[in-house]
Structure formats: structure tokens, C-alpha cells
Amino acid sequence: MLVIDPYKTWQTLAERLETETNPLHRRQLEQIIEHMKGEAAGDIDRILTTVSPKATYISYDNPIGPPRVFRGHDEIRQFYDQMLAAISVNLEYFVERLVVDDYYVVTEGVSKSAVKGAALSAMGVKVDDPNAYYLAQGRNVVIWPFDRDGMIMGECIYPGAGSAPADIAGRKLRPEEIGTYEEAA
């Protein structure tokens, strides 16, 4: 049984797309779905085709310090390189709430990721297998601004309460519990 299902990441957006009649909103949903599929494939170049070269990512994942800010494609590539160094590309972000307007899309839901044991070890957390993956989960809100050309202008990422690293180390995942994304042939 899958614990992490990457296909759930864009499920809510695809369902909304089926009934959305506003052409601008449809384009925004399509861009985010393509973006999410690029993330699921671990294809940074594909992700960047959906993101304006002027985009800014802001991650509020450090509760005691300033947010991490990544401007432009080169820095956004660094953001994804850092992320993929710590977790499996196969992650799930099940969107429970979705707001779409002419300038922004807001997604809120539960994220699950498979953290590399080696990444936990690097944080000083004891794991029984540095080559295994461990389950992290939490709630996230992502604000997706758009430019006039329909390109994503960045992500403002607000992670809510999530798994503490020591708790993650107690949730070792079996390979068959981590779903993988593959394009339809």
C-alpha cells in the first residue's frame, strides 16, 4: 500500500480544471499541474518552463530566522537541487483547499515526503539505515502568483507544523510504500 502517492499532488487541481470555465484560471491551473508533474519527475528544466525568469521563491521554513529567498531561474534551480539532495523526488502534496483568482492560486493541504536517512544523519539524527527513506509530513500553504503572460512568478511557501526530525527517523518507509511518477506513454 502506498504511503506517498505523487499523483495525488495535482488531483484536486485536475478536478477543478474539469469544471473551470474561466480561460485565465484554466491556464493557471494547467501551469501548476505541469509544474507539479515536473517536480514529481525530478525534472528541474521542465519545472522552469512554467516559471518566469523573474520569479521569486520564498520559503518560510525557518521559524527562528528569515525566510529563504531564491530569485530567478539560477537560484530557483539551487532551491530544487537542495530539496532533491534531502528528499526523494517522489512526494505527495494533497491539496485540500484551492483558491483561484486572476492573479494568484492558493493551495493548502498535507504534504508527505521521503527524507533520505543520510540527510537526517547530517542533522544529527540517529537513523538505523542512512540509505533508507523516512516519512515526513505536515501541512503547507503555497501562494502561486502569476504574471500577465500566465507564467508562475514564484512560490510563497508556508510550511505548518510538521514532523520533528527525531520523529521522522522512527517512520522508516519500505520501497513499495513510495509511489513513483511516470509519464503515460
Sequence positions of predicted segments:
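Exposed beta-sheet edge and beta->alpha loop/turn motif
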Residues: 109-148
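A short, structured loop/turn motif at beta-sheet edges
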Residues: 98-105, 145-153
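Low-complexity, intrinsically disordered terminal/linker segments enriched in charged
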Residues: 2-15, 131-132, 136, 151-185
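A solvent-exposed, acidic/Ser-Thr-rich amphipathic alpha-helical stretch
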Residues: 44-119
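Hydrophobic/aromatic beta-strand elements that line small-molecule binding cavities or substrate pockets
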Residues: 93-98, 139-145, 157-159
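Short, low-complexity N-terminal intrinsically disordered segments enriched in polar/charged residues
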Residues: 1-49, 53, 184
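Short solvent-exposed loop/turn micro-motifs enriched in small/polar/acidic residues
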Residues: 30, 89-91, 136-138
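Charged, low-complexity C-terminal accessory regions
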Residues: 15, 24, 141-148, 161
